[in-house]
């Protein structure tokens, strides 16, 4: 029997689900209340029934410098080559002391397997944390032996003493009657130039991550997984202002619009929104102890649908696929992986592009302001940045199913308001930013609409920052942050909804830092942090976990609130963590 809350499905889907098991109630381990260690509300990757084969990538490595950490990989024996699910598990820790947050990446054959950052330690807390990623869609890569590396640069000396340790493994769940083999891409190809793998530095808007490829000639669907991480001068891009305002409001220049642009042979092919990740040393390190910001430890790639280009990419000629970050201002690191589904019954798919209204729509935002400076030099008002683009990209491919017409219809919008109050006793800046994506991918065979994939994505960010003098000659810096991530997806087949899901992840954090007259930190107060992660789907799956902390100690943890029987409960083949899915109407398992 399906769980309560199940919504109506078609006969084919209901029949399939009747033969599948569900992941048992996701009950949390021992309560984290009272802990100072890393505590997050994020779900782990749900698992199918069966015993996995485990392949260790590396174990107990110490990261003390920027040296290479290579590893060799071979597919597991005893689990076949067509798996129900593949999961990456990684564990990290850093010794107590002083250390910056660091970027962590795992690679295999040039393909990124994991991307995130590390938790900063304190003088008394040695944090440890666990991350997981669903790599089932990368099964084609994992069927071949290869070489990979862990990239986690660190500095350990008399000042920065924190040593980072890490281990990682892959778990392969064999296909069975209860857990059928997943329908996965036939080719998994990196865009980076490093054959083993590393992120590509994009210094300006014109810096590309690109590769020229001669691809299989029978592509019927294509996607690109994109991660774009801000670094250096761009770390706090979400608070920056256009250059012409930077001196007046005492902020970083370069503007605050960032967006990844995907192109094929120089022609715009899609857009990947950039998430405003805040690292654990960001703004005020106490904000993120013990709960970091949204996805800080485990970035989720954004999947761009390139299926309208399938016919063009199958023509046997070399094609250049590229990613640029619009607005990059020294600098972003980027990773991109091309996923190709191939027609098993044809050696050659023919087709072409029919329409592309993204071409000619440059990613150039509109800037406005209400700033005013009075006779005393006090500044007040706001700077606004706006961009919204609606586009349609359509193409066709002659496949073994007949002619398939594919359309991506998408609106991508960015709004940002930077509000300032600056006078002799106050510097206050309030950031309100929202990145949104509303899109649908459609596939038709003849006159029949056979598949639709809808997505509604939101990245809200609010930062309220003030820096004020105190009566004793010192200063206080008060910060409040709200980060959010919501994603609603819906798959339809022949006009009927097969599956729908909602993911929500929010973090709210606040703290006040105290400084002496020489700007040395002398203490902090009022630290609070709360994270809420929720997932629901049309099959009755439900996940909800909330954690809260005060002064760096977990004060509350609740699981299953609002779920049937007060228990977290999801199907093993779903993706409650918000990891990307391919927009196939026949579901991705």
Which sequence ranges carry the predicted segments?
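Compositionally biased low-complexity segments at domain edges in trafficked proteins
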Residues: 182-206, 213, 346-414
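A short secondary-structure junction signal
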Residues: 203, 207-209, 232-240
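Beta-strand-rich ligand-recognition modules
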Residues: 29-70, 74-80, 91-187, 197, ...
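Extended extracellular/luminal ectodomain segments enriched in beta-structured repeat modules
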Residues: 78-87, 215-223, 234
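Bacterial N-terminal signal peptides
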Residues: 12-24
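Bacterial N-terminal signal peptides that target proteins for export
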Residues: 2-14
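Short, contiguous, pocket-lining structural segments
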Residues: 205, 216, 254
């Amino acid at each position: 029997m399906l769980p309560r809350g199940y919504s109506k499905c078609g006969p084919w889907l209901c029949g399939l689900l009747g033969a599948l098991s569900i992941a048992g109630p996701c009950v949390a381990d021992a309560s984290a209340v009272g802990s100072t260690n890393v505590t997050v509300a994020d779900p782990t990757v749900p698992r199918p029934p069966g015993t996995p084969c485990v392949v260790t990538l590396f174990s107990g490595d110490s990261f003390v410098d920027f040296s290479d950490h290579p590893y060799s990989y071979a597919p597991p024996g005893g689990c076949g080559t067509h798996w129900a699910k593949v999961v990456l598990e990684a564990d990290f820790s850093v010794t107590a002391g002083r250390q910056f947050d660091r970027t962590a990446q795992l690679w295999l054959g040039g393909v990124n397997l994991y991307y995130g950052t590390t938790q900063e330690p304190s003088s008394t807390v040695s944090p440890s944390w666990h991350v997981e990623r669903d790599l089932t869609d990368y099964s084609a890569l994992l069927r071949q032996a290869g070489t990979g590396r862990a990239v986690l640069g660190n500095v350990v000396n008399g000042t920065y003493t924190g040593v980072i340790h890490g281990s990682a493994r892959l778990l392969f769940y064999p296909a069975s009657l209860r857990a059928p083999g997943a329908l996965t891409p036939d080719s998994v190809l990196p865009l980076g130039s490093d054959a083993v793998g590393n992120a590509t530095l994009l210094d300006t808007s014109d810096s590309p991550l690109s590769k020229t490829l001669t691809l299989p000639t029978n592509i019927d669907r294509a996607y690109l997984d994109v991660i774009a991480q801000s670094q250096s001068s761009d770390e706090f891009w979400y608070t920056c202002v256009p250059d012409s305002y930077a001196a007046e409001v005492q902020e970083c220049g370069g503007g605050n619009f960032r967006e990844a642009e995907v192109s094929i042979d120089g022609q715009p092919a899609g857009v990947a929104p950039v998430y405003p990740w805040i690292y654990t040393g960001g703004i005020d390190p106490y904000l993120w102890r013990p709960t970091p910001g949204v996805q800080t430890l485990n970035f989720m790639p954004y999947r761009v649908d390139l299926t309208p280009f399938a016919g063009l990419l199958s023509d046997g000629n070399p094609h250049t696929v590229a990613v640029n970050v619009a607005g990059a201002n020294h600098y972003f690191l980027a990773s991109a992986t091309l996923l190709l589904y191939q027609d098993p019954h044809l050696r050659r798919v023919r087709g072409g592009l029919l329409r592309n209204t993204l071409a000619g729509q440059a990613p150039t935002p509109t800037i406005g302001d209400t700033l005013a400076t009075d006779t005393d030099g006090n500044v007040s008002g706001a700077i606004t940045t706006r961009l919204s683009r609606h586009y349609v990209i359509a193409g066709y491919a002659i496949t073994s199913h007949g002619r398939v017409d594919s359309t991506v219809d998408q609106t991508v919008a960015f709004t940002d308001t930077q509000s300032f109050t600056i006078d002799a006793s106050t510097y206050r800046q309030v950031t309100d930013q929202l990145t949104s994506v509303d899109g649908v991918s459609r596939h038709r065979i003849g006159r029949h609409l056979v598949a639709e994939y809808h997505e509604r994505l939101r990245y809200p960010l609010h930062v309220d920052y003030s820096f004020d003098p105190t009566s004793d000659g010192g200063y206080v810096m008060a910060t409040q942050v709200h980060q959010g991530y919501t994603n609603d997806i819906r798959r339809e087949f022949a006009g009927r909804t097969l599956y729908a899901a909602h993911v929500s992840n929010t973090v709210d954090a606040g703290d006040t830092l105290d400084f002496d007259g020489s700007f040395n930190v002398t203490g902090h107060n009022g630290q609070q942090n709360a994270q809420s992660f929720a997932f629901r789907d049309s099959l009755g799956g439900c996940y909800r976990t909330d954690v809260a902390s005060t002064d760096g100690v977990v004060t509350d943890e609740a699981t299953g609130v609002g779920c049937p029987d007060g228990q977290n409960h999801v199907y093993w083949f779903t993706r409650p963590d918000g990891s990307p899915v391919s927009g196939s109407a026949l579901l991705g398992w």
